[in-house]
Amino acid sequence: MKKIFILACAAVAAFSFASCQKNELQECDLVTATFTIVAPSDVAATKAVADGKNASNLVFAVFPYDLNATDNTNVAELVNLRKGDWNQNQTEVVFNDNLQATVQVSLVRGKAYQFVCWAQNKAAGCYDFSDMTAIEVDYEGAVAQDNDLRDAFYAHAVTVDSNKRPAKVTDGFSQTIVLRRPFAQINVGAADMSAASDAGLNINTIHSTMTVKGVANVLNTLDGSVSGSEDVSFSRALAVTNDTAASEYLTINAENGAYANAQYGWLAMNYVLVASAPANATHDITFSLYDGNSDADLLYTHSKTNVTLKRNFRTHLIGDVLTAVGTINVLIEEDFYDYDIVY
């Protein structure tokens, strides 16, 4: 199942271009270019957590693109679009209930462009996109651990022809852009929720914290690379399973029969920025579980070293984490498809 965002975007006639100066503007050829922005849904499409619907505000920027250049990442000129109130240098669009939005503006015929699309929840205070070429992540921002408002989607695209090659804008220009999460989603799942409850633990008050080492904090939106490195500690929060109206559990669609369609107590969920390559980047993760919201309520602290985190994948830490310090299994699940990698 896919969610489709419709976006028609371009530079308005009030702006000048290298070959279209202000005094020649009335002679410039402008065309309306239509972009279909597609954000694939999460594998658990019926769930409210991590289904992508919280990323309801779209910000985009338009930059010139030189078809003859070998590097278009050193952009000096932002084609300045103004709408909404997020930042005067970007256009912000609120999607409707069907996750669709349309902006009508124009591009100059015969010019090539590149686009940065960023979709997030407007209430998420953890992303700084004042420079749309370098989006910064604040892991101590307004959104706490286990809160799906951190979910966001990103894409960089260039105007292309029917053969998907970089090209100039022509009449009737249209293009599809696919958004992906630039993050890895880290989840902690308890296989022993029932056993813990039978042993007298009040599973309705379970809280968790998490620390992830060596996390990037800047996304270069023009080439997809990341930079920065910090050890990120997410503050204590109520378990996802207990903090949702539907008492959602972590469901894993794994090829491995031991995990296929099983449900686990969803104790923690966090998004961290990771590189698209190399695909085998590893991080050390520590998470602590509490039967209340104070340090004195600590149950267990678990650590897992060299955990693989992949962009646009979900990494699950699964085990009997509430009743004993035992084996924690690591599963890597590609976020928008129906199979898992288990090791």
Question: What are the language-model segments listed below?
Answer:
Residues 1-30:
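Bacterial Sec-dependent N-terminal signal peptides
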